[in-house]
Amino acid sequence: MTLLDRIETLRTRHRSLEEAIDREVTRPAPNMETISDLKRQKLRIKDEIVQLEHTA
C-alpha cells in the first residue's frame, strides 16, 4: 500500500466516523460516551492524515 493509498483509506474511515457521529447525535437518546469515543477515533485519524501528508 502506497502512502497515498493509506491517506485515502484514512480519509474514508474519517468520513465513516463522521457519519456514525451524525447518526448517534440524531438518535432520540444519543449515547454521549459513544459519541466521545467516535470523536476521539476521528481525531486520531485526522492527526495521522496530517502527519502522513507532511511526509508525502
Model-derived segments and spans:
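Extended, charge-rich alpha-helical interface modules
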Residues: 1-56
